[in-house]
Amino acid sequence: MLINKCNQDAQGNCVKSARVEDALARLSHEDSKLGVNMLNAAVAGAVVARQPADTILRAEAAEAWNSIRPVIARHLTCEEDIVLPWAKSLKDFPPDLILRACEQRQRLCNLGRIVDAVSFITGTDEEVTKAGTALTAFAVCLDDLVDCEERDLFPMIQRALFGESSGAGA
């Protein structure tokens, strides 16, 4: 009976690890594809914040936001639902990496709500200025998040996964 429980636990850990590996690959791929869109969003937000009456700049800001919003929504959901809970469940995973990821995620969500609350097309000049400024801050924060993920969080997750898989065979 105890052996069956251990086998079930090992299988459960393998399934969780496989989900995390898949999520990590997807997140890394999304990070690499976001570069140009982040730059476009930062520029479009800054420009429309300075010239909110320009309808072409409003359309460009809306297009820039709409190009990154769905990717970021999936990205943040994947981190929240799969990656961060898994990392939190590990005893030796650095808590500062988890805390930093959670803080950056929260900041992105707050900035995203500001941008989402306004229509770049129909909003007042004041609203568009606020949303444009938030869009630029969002893009900068997103760039910081991607940098931290690629430099710190993802390599640590890979080491933890590698340690799990090599430890499972011992």
Predicted region positions:
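Small-residue-biased structural context
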Residues: M1-A170
